[in-house]
Amino acid sequence: MEKDPSQEQDVSSDYPIIHQQLITAKSKWEKEVLSELPKIDERNFPIAHPDFPITQLPARDAKTIGGIIRSNRWPNCSFYTSWKKEEDKIYWKGEVLTAGQYQPVIYYTCAEENVGLTINISDKNKILTRTKIKEAFHPPLRGMEYDKIERGESYVKDWNPLVLNPISLSKGPIELALTASDIQGGQAIDFRLMTLERVVTK
């Protein structure tokens, strides 16, 4: 590792026994573990696990409909932007594990000219709660000041928490979605994360 920190040199012929051990271990893992995993994971996102009072629903794990785009192809630290139409949607196909009342908090940024829009939380087409964006919060991206070369991953920024009225969730499948209405200035919010904190258990 010290002589070749970038690991560019093939040293398998210098260490044939270790090389064969690694090949055997990989083959065993593929047969015993990888073979049991689906090529496409269709499991629903777990929401409201009984052992955890707060569920995090990040942009990283969400899907979208419409013109909303991710800040970067790499999901970690990414956020959603270019949210311009009422038909646009951010959603999670989830599974509620514990029924109850939950307090949503949305982490967003919004330019001054876009203040006044309404954010809706829904299950499929049923509105669970909604609120108006009354406060502008529009900090710049940061992180590039620490880079010696341009990073491939998303830059980050600070986010403003917005507390919404509690919502009632029943146990079972759910398609939890965010939509925007009364969009001002041709743009809704940038979105990073929604949390759901359990306040009452059914």
Q: What do the predicted segments below correspond to?
A:
Residues 4-14, 19-202:
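Extracytoplasmic
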Residues 1:
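Extracellular, beta-strand-rich glycan-interacting domains
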